[in-house]
C-alpha cells in the first residue's frame, strides 16, 4: 500500500540532492551507474542519505537523494532514453522509502530494466522482491519496535540473492541498544 502518495500526492520537490549532497552530480555522460536514495516518509528522516549521496558524487558516481515518493520521478528518469539507463541501477531505501524503492523496481520489471542492487533499511511489511532485482540486502532491527520489520522475500520467479540481516541478532557487529529506526542511516 502506498499510503504516502495519498498523504502527499504531489511529486514536485522530490529531488533533495541539490540541498543535501552539497555538490553537484557529475555529468551523466561521464558516469555509468545510477544510485537512488529513497528517504523515509518525511524529509527530516534518513538524514544520512544526503551525506552518502554527496560522498558518492564526489567519487564520480551519479547519485540522487529523494523523498520516498520519488519513485515516479526515478521511473521517468530511467525510461526516458530509448536504450535504457547506462550502467547499473542501484536503489537504497529507508523505511517507507524502501517500500517505494521496491515499487519502483516492480514498475521497471516489465520494461526490462534491471536493478543491480536493492538495499532496504528498516522496511516494515516489505512487498516481495521483483524478478528484475539481481541482489538485495535488508538491514533491520527486531527489538524496540513500533511496527514490524522483517526479512525480504522473493516474488515467484525472482532469482535475486537476498541477504537479510537482523542487527539485533546474536553476533551482530552493532552494539545492542545503540541503533534505532531514526539513526540507522547516520551510522
Residue ranges and their predicted role:
Residues 53, 63-69, 75-158:
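Serine-dependent carboxylesterase/thioesterase catalytic core
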Residues 2-10:
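Helix-enriched interaction subdomains in cytosolic or periplasmic regions
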Residues 13-14, 110:
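Secondary-structure boundary elements
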Residues 40, 123, 141, 167-169:
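Active-site donor-binding loop signature of nucleotide-sugar glycosyltransferases
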Residues 14-20, 144-145, 182-187:
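C-terminal partner/receptor-binding element of secreted or periplasmic proteins
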Residues 8, 19-87:
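Active-site catalytic motif of lipid deacylating hydrolases and related acyltransferases
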Residues 1-2, 159-167:
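Intrinsic disorder/low-complexity detector
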Residues 163-187:
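C-terminal catalytic histidine-bearing segment of alpha/beta-hydrolase fold enzymes
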Amino acid at each position: 500500500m502506498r499510503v504516502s502518495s495519498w498523504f502527499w500526492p504531489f511529486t514536485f520537490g522530490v529531488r533533495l540532492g541539490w540541498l543535501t549532497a552539497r555538490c553537484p552530480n557529475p555529468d551523466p555522460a561521464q558516469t555509468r551507474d545510477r544510485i537512488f536514495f529513497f528517504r523515509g516518509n518525511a524529509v527530516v528522516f534518513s538524514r544520512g542519505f544526503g551525506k552518502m549521496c554527496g560522498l558518492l558524487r564526489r567519487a564520480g558516481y551519479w547519485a540522487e537523494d529523494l523523498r520516498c515518493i520519488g519513485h515516479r520521478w526515478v521511473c521517468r528518469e530511467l525510461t526516458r532514453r530509448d536504450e535504457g539507463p547506462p550502467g547499473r541501477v542501484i536503489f537504497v531505501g529507508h523505511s517507507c522509502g524502501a517500500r517505494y524503492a521496491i515499487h519502483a523496481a516492480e514498475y521497471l520489471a516489465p520494461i526490462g530494466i534491471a536493478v543491480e542492487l536493492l538495499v532496504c533499511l528498516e522496511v516494515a511489511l516489505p512487498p516481495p522482491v521483483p524478478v528484475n532485482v539481481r541482489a538485495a540486502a535488508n538491514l533491520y532491527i527486531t527489538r524496540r519496535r513500533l511496527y514490524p520489520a522483517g526479512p525480504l522475500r522473493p516474488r515467484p520467479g525472482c532469482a535475486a540473492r537476498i541477504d537479510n540481516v537482523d542487527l539485533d541478532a546474536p553476533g551482530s557487529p552493532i552494539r545492542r541498544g545503540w541503533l534505532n529506526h531514526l539513526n540507522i542511516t547516520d551510522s
